[in-house]
From Swiss-Prot:
NCBIfam families, per database record: miaA
Amino acids binding substrate: 12-17
UniProt keyword terms in alphabetical order: ATP-binding, Magnesium, Nucleotide-binding, Transferase, tRNA processing
Function, as annotated: Catalyzes the transfer of a dimethylallyl group onto the adenine at position 37 in tRNAs that read codons beginning with uridine, leading to the formation of N6-(dimethylallyl)adenosine (i(6)A).
Species annotation: Legionella pneumophila (strain Paris)
Site, as annotated: Interaction with substrate tRNA: 101, 123
Name of the featured protein: tRNA dimethylallyltransferase
Residue numbers binding ATP: 10-17
Family stated for the protein in its record: Belongs to the IPP transferase family.
Catalytic activity: adenosine(37) in tRNA + dimethylallyl diphosphate = N(6)-dimethylallyladenosine(37) in tRNA + diphosphate
Subunit structure: Monomer.
This protein's encoding gene: miaA
Amino acid sequence: MNKLVFCLMGPTASGKTGLACELLTHFPFEIISVDSAMIYRDMNIGTAKPSIHELQRAPHYLIDIKDPVESYSAAQFCTDALSLCAEIIKRGNIPLLVGGTMMYFNALQKGLATLPEADEAVRKRLEEEALSQGWDFLYQKLSQLDPVTAARIHAHDTQRIQRALEVYYLTGSTLSTYLTGPHVQPDYYFVNLALFPEQRSWLHERIAQRFDAMLSEGFIEEVQQLQAKWPIQINLPSMRCVGYRQILEYLAGHYDYETMREKGIAATRQLAKRQLTWLRHWEGALFYDSQNVGFNIDIIAKIREILDNTVSN
Protein backbone atom coordinates (compact mmCIF):
# COMPACT_ATOMS: atom_id res chain seq x y z
CA MET A 1 0.00 0.00 0.00
CA ASN A 2 2.95 2.33 0.53
CA LYS A 3 3.32 3.06 -3.19
CA LEU A 4 -0.36 3.07 -4.14
CA VAL A 5 -1.80 6.23 -5.71
CA PHE A 6 -5.45 6.57 -6.74
CA CYS A 7 -6.45 8.84 -9.62
CA LEU A 8 -10.01 10.05 -10.12
CA MET A 9 -10.23 11.42 -13.64
CA GLY A 10 -13.04 12.46 -15.93
CA PRO A 11 -14.46 15.19 -18.14
CA THR A 12 -15.59 18.54 -16.83
CA ALA A 13 -18.98 18.49 -15.05
CA SER A 14 -18.92 14.71 -14.52
CA GLY A 15 -19.04 14.88 -10.71
CA LYS A 16 -15.39 14.40 -9.70
CA THR A 17 -15.28 16.94 -6.86
CA GLY A 18 -18.39 15.69 -5.09
CA LEU A 19 -17.24 12.09 -5.33
CA ALA A 20 -13.74 12.94 -4.09
CA CYS A 21 -15.18 14.63 -1.00
CA GLU A 22 -17.35 11.56 -0.38
CA LEU A 23 -14.38 9.19 -0.72
CA LEU A 24 -12.56 11.03 2.07
CA THR A 25 -15.26 9.90 4.49
CA HIS A 26 -14.43 6.26 3.71
CA PHE A 27 -10.66 6.14 3.16
CA PRO A 28 -7.45 7.80 4.47
CA PHE A 29 -7.07 9.86 1.30
CA GLU A 30 -5.49 13.27 0.84
CA ILE A 31 -6.53 15.09 -2.33
CA ILE A 32 -4.15 16.53 -4.92
CA SER A 33 -5.87 18.62 -7.59
CA VAL A 34 -4.99 17.80 -11.21
CA ASP A 35 -6.49 20.87 -12.84
CA SER A 36 -4.61 23.47 -14.86
CA ALA A 37 -7.34 26.06 -14.17
CA MET A 38 -7.76 25.66 -10.41
CA ILE A 39 -4.10 26.50 -9.84
CA TYR A 40 -4.95 30.19 -10.32
CA ARG A 41 -5.85 32.52 -7.47
CA ASP A 42 -8.92 34.75 -7.84
CA MET A 43 -10.36 32.43 -10.50
CA ASN A 44 -13.00 30.59 -8.52
CA ILE A 45 -16.38 30.66 -10.23
CA GLY A 46 -15.27 29.94 -13.78
CA THR A 47 -12.96 27.09 -12.76
CA ALA A 48 -15.67 25.40 -10.64
CA LYS A 49 -13.34 25.27 -7.65
CA PRO A 50 -14.59 23.33 -4.65
CA SER A 51 -16.61 25.55 -2.33
CA ILE A 52 -15.19 26.84 0.95
CA HIS A 53 -17.36 24.27 2.73
CA GLU A 54 -16.01 21.47 0.52
CA LEU A 55 -12.41 22.59 1.05
CA GLN A 56 -12.95 22.64 4.81
CA ARG A 57 -14.20 19.05 4.65
CA ALA A 58 -11.69 17.95 2.05
CA PRO A 59 -8.58 20.14 1.60
CA HIS A 60 -7.08 20.07 -1.90
CA TYR A 61 -3.39 20.54 -2.68
CA LEU A 62 -2.31 22.48 -5.80
CA ILE A 63 -5.26 24.88 -5.75
CA ASP A 64 -4.57 28.65 -5.64
CA ILE A 65 -0.81 28.32 -6.12
CA LYS A 66 -0.30 30.76 -9.02
CA ASP A 67 -1.37 34.29 -9.92
CA PRO A 68 -3.40 34.62 -13.14
CA VAL A 69 -0.46 36.25 -14.92
CA GLU A 70 1.88 33.33 -14.19
CA SER A 71 2.38 30.08 -16.08
CA TYR A 72 2.62 26.50 -14.85
CA SER A 73 3.89 23.54 -16.85
CA ALA A 74 3.31 19.81 -16.81
CA ALA A 75 6.90 19.43 -15.58
CA GLN A 76 6.20 21.72 -12.61
CA PHE A 77 3.05 19.76 -11.86
CA CYS A 78 4.97 16.46 -11.84
CA THR A 79 7.56 17.86 -9.45
CA ASP A 80 4.90 19.21 -7.09
CA ALA A 81 2.63 16.17 -7.28
CA LEU A 82 5.40 13.62 -6.71
CA SER A 83 6.67 15.59 -3.73
CA LEU A 84 3.16 15.70 -2.25
CA CYS A 85 2.63 11.98 -2.87
CA ALA A 86 5.78 11.19 -0.92
CA GLU A 87 4.69 13.43 1.98
CA ILE A 88 1.18 11.95 2.07
CA ILE A 89 2.46 8.37 2.07
CA LYS A 90 4.98 9.25 4.78
CA ARG A 91 2.05 10.39 6.94
CA GLY A 92 0.45 6.98 6.47
CA ASN A 93 -2.25 8.22 4.11
CA ILE A 94 -3.00 7.59 0.42
CA PRO A 95 -2.78 10.18 -2.37
CA LEU A 96 -5.97 10.75 -4.36
CA LEU A 97 -5.33 12.77 -7.50
CA VAL A 98 -8.52 14.39 -8.79
CA GLY A 99 -9.07 16.36 -11.98
CA GLY A 100 -9.48 16.54 -15.71
CA THR A 101 -6.17 17.88 -17.01
CA MET A 102 -5.26 14.71 -18.81
CA MET A 103 -1.88 15.98 -19.98
CA TYR A 104 -0.84 16.28 -16.32
CA PHE A 105 -2.01 12.74 -15.56
CA ASN A 106 -0.17 11.48 -18.64
CA ALA A 107 3.07 13.25 -17.72
CA LEU A 108 2.91 12.03 -14.12
CA GLN A 109 2.23 8.38 -14.91
CA LYS A 110 4.28 7.91 -18.05
CA GLY A 111 7.07 10.34 -17.31
CA LEU A 112 8.00 13.45 -19.22
CA ALA A 113 9.80 13.01 -22.49
CA THR A 114 13.08 14.79 -23.01
CA LEU A 115 11.72 17.38 -25.41
CA PRO A 116 13.95 19.83 -27.26
CA GLU A 117 14.49 23.27 -25.78
CA ALA A 118 12.55 26.17 -27.25
CA ASP A 119 14.13 27.55 -30.39
CA GLU A 120 13.65 31.29 -30.94
CA ALA A 121 14.24 31.09 -34.68
CA VAL A 122 11.59 28.41 -35.17
CA ARG A 123 9.15 30.23 -32.90
CA LYS A 124 9.65 33.49 -34.77
CA ARG A 125 9.04 31.70 -38.05
CA LEU A 126 5.82 30.18 -36.73
CA GLU A 127 4.64 33.53 -35.35
CA GLU A 128 5.29 35.19 -38.70
CA GLU A 129 3.37 32.41 -40.42
CA ALA A 130 0.51 32.91 -37.96
CA LEU A 131 0.44 36.64 -38.72
CA SER A 132 0.26 36.05 -42.45
CA GLN A 133 -1.88 32.88 -42.58
CA GLY A 134 -3.66 32.81 -39.23
CA TRP A 135 -3.54 30.34 -36.34
CA ASP A 136 -6.36 28.31 -37.88
CA PHE A 137 -4.01 27.58 -40.78
CA LEU A 138 -1.29 26.40 -38.38
CA TYR A 139 -3.80 24.27 -36.49
CA GLN A 140 -4.82 22.59 -39.75
CA LYS A 141 -1.15 21.99 -40.53
CA LEU A 142 -0.71 20.39 -37.10
CA SER A 143 -3.80 18.25 -37.74
CA GLN A 144 -2.10 16.86 -40.84
CA LEU A 145 1.33 16.37 -39.25
CA ASP A 146 0.22 15.15 -35.82
CA PRO A 147 -3.53 14.41 -35.70
CA VAL A 148 -3.25 12.80 -32.26
CA THR A 149 -1.89 15.97 -30.64
CA ALA A 150 -4.27 18.19 -32.62
CA ALA A 151 -7.24 16.22 -31.28
CA ARG A 152 -6.07 16.83 -27.72
CA ILE A 153 -5.67 20.61 -27.86
CA HIS A 154 -8.07 23.42 -28.65
CA ALA A 155 -7.90 25.09 -32.06
CA HIS A 156 -7.36 28.44 -30.29
CA ASP A 157 -4.62 27.21 -27.93
CA THR A 158 -1.88 29.05 -29.80
CA GLN A 159 0.85 28.27 -27.26
CA ARG A 160 0.41 24.50 -27.54
CA ILE A 161 -0.07 24.62 -31.32
CA GLN A 162 3.21 26.51 -31.61
CA ARG A 163 5.02 24.10 -29.28
CA ALA A 164 3.77 20.99 -31.10
CA LEU A 165 4.86 22.35 -34.49
CA GLU A 166 8.17 23.52 -33.01
CA VAL A 167 8.93 19.99 -31.74
CA TYR A 168 8.14 18.56 -35.17
CA TYR A 169 10.30 21.07 -37.05
CA LEU A 170 13.23 20.62 -34.66
CA THR A 171 13.20 16.82 -34.45
CA GLY A 172 11.15 15.45 -37.33
CA SER A 173 9.09 13.54 -34.75
CA THR A 174 5.61 14.41 -33.53
CA LEU A 175 4.85 15.53 -30.00
CA SER A 176 2.48 12.57 -29.60
CA THR A 177 5.38 10.22 -30.39
CA TYR A 178 7.40 11.77 -27.57
CA LEU A 179 4.50 11.51 -25.14
CA THR A 180 3.87 7.82 -25.89
CA GLY A 181 7.49 6.72 -26.08
CA PRO A 182 9.40 4.88 -23.34
CA HIS A 183 10.19 7.19 -20.42
CA VAL A 184 11.36 6.88 -16.85
CA GLN A 185 8.24 6.34 -14.74
CA PRO A 186 7.74 7.30 -11.09
CA ASP A 187 7.93 4.55 -8.51
CA TYR A 188 4.20 4.35 -7.80
CA TYR A 189 1.33 2.07 -8.70
CA PHE A 190 -1.50 4.16 -10.14
CA VAL A 191 -5.12 3.05 -9.92
CA ASN A 192 -7.10 5.04 -12.49
CA LEU A 193 -10.80 5.50 -11.78
CA ALA A 194 -12.41 7.14 -14.80
CA LEU A 195 -15.82 8.82 -14.81
CA PHE A 196 -17.09 8.24 -18.32
CA PRO A 197 -20.73 9.23 -18.99
CA GLU A 198 -22.03 7.08 -21.81
CA GLN A 199 -24.75 9.54 -22.85
CA ARG A 200 -23.15 12.70 -24.22
CA SER A 201 -26.52 14.48 -24.06
CA TRP A 202 -26.51 14.08 -20.26
CA LEU A 203 -23.05 15.60 -19.98
CA HIS A 204 -23.87 18.37 -22.46
CA GLU A 205 -26.95 19.35 -20.45
CA ARG A 206 -24.95 19.42 -17.21
CA ILE A 207 -22.33 21.62 -18.88
CA ALA A 208 -24.98 24.10 -20.04
CA GLN A 209 -26.64 24.17 -16.63
CA ARG A 210 -23.34 24.68 -14.86
CA PHE A 211 -22.24 27.49 -17.18
CA ASP A 212 -25.56 29.27 -16.62
CA ALA A 213 -25.13 28.80 -12.87
CA MET A 214 -21.64 30.32 -13.08
CA LEU A 215 -23.03 33.36 -14.87
CA SER A 216 -25.71 33.72 -12.18
CA GLU A 217 -23.07 33.42 -9.45
CA GLY A 218 -21.05 36.33 -10.86
CA PHE A 219 -18.67 34.87 -13.47
CA ILE A 220 -18.65 38.12 -15.48
CA GLU A 221 -17.96 40.15 -12.34
CA GLU A 222 -15.12 37.76 -11.47
CA VAL A 223 -13.44 38.49 -14.81
CA GLN A 224 -13.93 42.23 -14.30
CA GLN A 225 -12.25 41.95 -10.90
CA LEU A 226 -9.35 40.08 -12.50
CA GLN A 227 -8.96 42.91 -15.02
CA ALA A 228 -8.97 45.47 -12.22
CA LYS A 229 -6.35 43.61 -10.18
CA TRP A 230 -4.03 42.11 -12.82
CA PRO A 231 -2.71 43.09 -16.27
CA ILE A 232 -4.96 40.49 -17.89
CA GLN A 233 -4.41 39.73 -21.57
CA ILE A 234 -6.36 37.26 -23.66
CA ASN A 235 -3.21 35.28 -24.60
CA LEU A 236 -2.28 34.45 -20.99
CA PRO A 237 -2.35 30.72 -20.14
CA SER A 238 -4.94 31.43 -17.44
CA MET A 239 -7.28 33.03 -19.97
CA ARG A 240 -7.30 29.85 -22.04
CA CYS A 241 -9.52 28.35 -19.35
CA VAL A 242 -12.96 27.84 -20.86
CA GLY A 243 -15.35 30.70 -20.27
CA TYR A 244 -12.76 33.33 -19.41
CA ARG A 245 -11.75 34.02 -23.00
CA GLN A 246 -15.39 34.29 -24.08
CA ILE A 247 -16.23 36.73 -21.28
CA LEU A 248 -13.16 38.84 -22.09
CA GLU A 249 -14.38 39.05 -25.68
CA TYR A 250 -17.85 39.99 -24.41
CA LEU A 251 -16.46 42.72 -22.15
CA ALA A 252 -14.40 44.05 -25.07
CA GLY A 253 -17.61 44.41 -27.08
CA HIS A 254 -16.83 41.63 -29.57
CA TYR A 255 -19.81 39.48 -28.55
CA ASP A 256 -23.28 40.14 -27.24
CA TYR A 257 -24.36 38.31 -24.08
CA GLU A 258 -26.12 35.41 -25.80
CA THR A 259 -23.21 34.82 -28.19
CA MET A 260 -20.80 34.81 -25.24
CA ARG A 261 -22.99 32.28 -23.43
CA GLU A 262 -23.27 30.01 -26.47
CA LYS A 263 -19.54 30.16 -27.17
CA GLY A 264 -18.71 29.48 -23.52
CA ILE A 265 -20.92 26.39 -23.44
CA ALA A 266 -19.57 25.20 -26.80
CA ALA A 267 -15.95 25.62 -25.62
CA THR A 268 -16.70 23.64 -22.46
CA ARG A 269 -18.27 20.84 -24.49
CA GLN A 270 -15.21 20.77 -26.74
CA LEU A 271 -13.01 20.48 -23.65
CA ALA A 272 -15.10 17.54 -22.44
CA LYS A 273 -14.77 15.89 -25.85
CA ARG A 274 -10.96 16.15 -25.69
CA GLN A 275 -10.92 14.78 -22.15
CA LEU A 276 -13.06 11.82 -23.21
CA THR A 277 -10.70 11.19 -26.13
CA TRP A 278 -7.82 10.86 -23.67
CA LEU A 279 -9.83 8.59 -21.38
CA ARG A 280 -11.08 6.34 -24.16
CA HIS A 281 -7.50 5.26 -24.86
CA TRP A 282 -6.29 5.14 -21.25
CA GLU A 283 -4.88 1.67 -20.77
CA GLY A 284 -5.97 -0.11 -17.61
CA ALA A 285 -8.50 2.50 -16.46
CA LEU A 286 -11.58 1.38 -14.53
CA PHE A 287 -14.60 3.06 -16.10
CA TYR A 288 -17.75 4.20 -14.29
CA ASP A 289 -20.78 5.95 -15.74
CA SER A 290 -21.42 8.85 -13.37
CA GLN A 291 -25.00 9.29 -14.54
CA ASN A 292 -25.91 5.86 -13.16
CA VAL A 293 -27.46 5.69 -9.71
CA GLY A 294 -25.07 3.99 -7.31
CA PHE A 295 -21.90 4.48 -9.36
CA ASN A 296 -20.25 5.95 -6.25
CA ILE A 297 -21.06 2.80 -4.27
CA ASP A 298 -19.40 0.70 -6.98
CA ILE A 299 -16.27 2.86 -6.83
CA ILE A 300 -16.12 2.68 -3.03
CA ALA A 301 -16.41 -1.11 -3.22
CA LYS A 302 -13.65 -1.33 -5.83
CA ILE A 303 -11.29 0.87 -3.79
CA ARG A 304 -11.94 -1.22 -0.69
CA GLU A 305 -11.26 -4.40 -2.66
CA ILE A 306 -7.97 -3.02 -4.00
CA LEU A 307 -6.84 -1.86 -0.56
CA ASP A 308 -7.78 -5.19 1.05
CA ASN A 309 -5.87 -7.12 -1.62
CA THR A 310 -2.86 -4.84 -1.23
CA VAL A 311 -2.76 -5.33 2.53
CA SER A 312 -3.19 -9.11 2.26
CA ASN A 313 -0.37 -9.33 -0.27
